[in-house]
Amino acid sequence: MGKVYVFDHPLIQHKLTYIRDKNTGTKEFRELVEEVATLMAFEITRDLPLEEVEIETPVSKAKSKVIAGKKLGVIPILRAGIGMVDGILKLIPAAKVGHIGLYRDPETLKPVEYYVKLPTDVEERDFIVVDPMLATGGSAVEAINALKKRGAKSIKFMCLIAAPEGVEAVKKAHPDVDIYIAALDEKLNDHGYIVPGLGDAGDRLFGTK
């Protein structure tokens, strides 16, 4: 059964304050999102398995630990998820990066995939799906669906800010997926924005509307 983790680390909360602030410019916003993604990746990878190897220091031979051959994949949901990728790759530079693009069907209002590019060895990888916002949960649910349809067995979802409605939607559709959140906000408003949230993450990351 998947769990929900909300990070209360002081550095994450400090940086989130400036991410939320409407007066934060594009450059600083982009840097802060990347930094928080790095801090969250540190926590998410805490359970990676280790194995012992023998090395030689300048002083003597020694036994030490390395990550036990895990294959990791980072999957940003386009377009805002791209802003979190480099922060994760700073800690896990060998991870493969895929992409999932979704658009909202004008009639059903449900997300539909228009672009999926994944590593070839999907079944062998542990995936982290990233998107700054988890609002209604529709995009996250569909992105995880896209991975599972292609054989993914191990999936985590990571976002900066979530609404309770989005968390419940992902838990209901994918009860096996762990959800990692920097902040759990109050609710969604009538327009589907998280309150208090941070506005449109994609617009603020790329300086476009």
Curated annotation (Swiss-Prot):
Biological processes annotated in GO: UMP salvage; uracil salvage
Pathway the protein acts in: Pyrimidine metabolism; UMP biosynthesis via salvage pathway; UMP from uracil: step 1/1
Record comment: activity regulation: Allosterically activated by GTP.
Names of the cofactor(s): Mg(2+)
Alphabetic keyword roster: Allosteric enzyme, Glycosyltransferase, GTP-binding, Magnesium, Nucleotide-binding, Transferase
Stored CDD domains: PRTases_typeI
Pfam families from the UniProt entry: UPRTase
InterPro entries assigned: PRibTrfase_dom, PRTase-like, Upp_B, UPRTase/APRTase, Ura_phspho_trans
GO MF, any single term: GTP binding
E.C. number: 2.4.2.9
CC cofactor note: Binds 1 Mg(2+) ion per subunit. The magnesium is bound as Mg-PRPP.
Residues the record lists as binding 5-phospho-alpha-D-ribose 1-diphosphate: 79, 104, 131-139, 200
Key word Magnesium present: yes
NCBIfam families: PRK00129.1 (NF001097), upp (TIGR01091)
Family: Belongs to the UPRTase family.
Annotated function: Catalyzes the conversion of uracil and 5-phospho-alpha-D-ribose 1-diphosphate (PRPP) to UMP and diphosphate.
Protein name, UniProt field: Uracil phosphoribosyltransferase
